[in-house]
């Protein structure tokens, strides 16, 4: 399909404006789920977050799977309606959140979304449920108003980003065909300004080292 025209985008934006209250209410539901992946007592909450997200992705018009891993599941949504010749965009995000402690430093409860000065305060609102949900709502707006998009889209949402993504690499290696794409859009990066769109092209990443040191069996004088 052809790229969207200015008139097409106007229709999409009108849909978004007319559904903002619903979008906000849905996001609040998402933020109320304490999907703390690092704590075993929140295993069921994290799974509930995955199921909730899968349902909303399906509502948006994607074909959705919840795929088990040795840890928390991956939610995978696909829309392939643009055809094999069209490029594919993969949107990455995560539905798990950091523990909220220390609780005494919160002005409002971490899992009860509160709006102050035009900002939503809750654990996960900016890392990463808010951004991830924004992309899903954008897809819903496009598919509802036009029934198609000029590109294929894959949405990959994991539930272990806050614990170092231990099962993401094996998942990717086992699903290379499903995840094949032309560009990856990561919904979990910084913004320089609300008024300055930007594209981050690299991140610091993580490096792990294991160091083994051997020495003398007893203390030696520094000159020996």
Which residues are covered by each model-predicted region?
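Structural motif
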Residues: 87-90, 119, 153-154, 182-184, ...
């Amino acid at each position: 399909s052809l790229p969207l025209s200015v008139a097409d985008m106007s229709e999409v934006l009108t849909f978004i404006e007319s559904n903002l209250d619903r979008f906000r209410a849905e996001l609040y539901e998402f933020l109320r789920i304490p999907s703390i992946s690092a704590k075993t007592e929140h295993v069921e909450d994290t799974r509930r977050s995955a199921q909730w997200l899968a349902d909303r992705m399906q509502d948006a018009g994607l074909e959705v799977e919840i795929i088990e891993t040795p840890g928390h599941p991956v939610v995978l949504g696909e829309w392939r309606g643009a055809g094999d010749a069209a490029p594919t965009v993969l949107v990455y995000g995560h539905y798990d959140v950091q523990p909220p402690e220390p609780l005494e430093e919160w002005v409002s409860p971490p899992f009860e979304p509160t709006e102050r000065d035009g900002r939503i305060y809750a654990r996960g609102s900016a890392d990463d449920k808010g951004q991830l949900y924004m992309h899903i709502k954008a897809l819903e707006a496009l598919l509802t108003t036009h029934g198609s998009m000029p590109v294929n889209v894959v949405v990959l949402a994991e539930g272990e980003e806050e614990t170092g993504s231990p099962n993401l690499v094996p998942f990717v290696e086992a699903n290379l065909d499903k995840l094949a794409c032309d560009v990856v859009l990561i919904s979990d990066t910084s913004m320089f300004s609300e008024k300055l769109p930007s594209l981050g092209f690299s991140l610091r990443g993580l490096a792990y080292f294991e160091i083994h040191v051997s020495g003398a069996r007893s203390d030696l004088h520094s000159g020996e």
